[in-house]
Amino acid sequence: MIIMTILSLLLTNAVTLRRDISILFNRIVIIALIYCILHDTMSLSIISKGVGLHGGLLHITNITQVFQIFIFLISILILQLTSFDPIKKFYIMRHPRFINKWPRAIGYSIPLSTPLPPPLRGGGVDLFILLDACLLWANSGTISRSPDFIITKLYCIFHCSFILLGLGVGGLLYGSSTTSLDGLYIINSIQSHVNYSIINPLYRHFNKIQIKMLNNKFLRLSMGAILAHANYDT
């Protein structure tokens, strides 16, 4: 459902001539998340015993479904803060009776043309963040629990490089057939054999402010794992 919503938003923004504002995208994302919550609640009774694919690589249980529902609810609460303009309040404050009775209140009115701050623009990036969280949480490996702190920071950082990093780690967990404790052993073995002379130039491209927000060790491990996995595929 999240992937279909992402594709539909990208298509509507690329094909149509009209350029919608970010508030409309936020409202569409809220409706899509409500459908996701309904879909997950209806599937709780069906997958009561859990569903596992590829030896536990994709493992879905009621616990993971409840966790996804909780993330969707929090995301709806975050998006609804910036999805609706105080239009009624604005016009009430501009009414002549209101101006004559409370003239000082006009200074506190919010104009409709006030731009939103950059971290609150658009709901498309929030869908990518939710997709990262669902990919990481659905994996039964132990290493899929450690990057969860990135998901909470992505709402504040809101930068493309960290979203791509989360998608890369999620794709790595799905592309490699490693589960449970085997994943920790393989990632640690990759770290010991990785040539950091190749990773350091890529590592320097990240902004210094953004690097301080992340754990440097995890960033190096993620890059090393992705590069090593690409070498294994070739």
UniProtKB/Swiss-Prot annotation:
Subcellular localization(s) per the UniProt record: Mitochondrion membrane
Example of a GO cellular component annotation carried by this entry: mitochondrial membrane
Topology relative to the membrane: Multi-pass membrane protein
Domain of life: Eukaryota
Keyword set includes Zinc: no
Entry's family note: Belongs to the complex I subunit 2 family.
Protein's name in the database: Putative uncharacterized mitochondrial protein NCU16001
Organism of derivation: Neurospora crassa (strain ATCC 24698 / 74-OR23-1A / CBS 708.71 / DSM 1257 / FGSC 987)
Native organism taxonomy: Eukaryota, Fungi, Dikarya, Ascomycota, Pezizomycotina
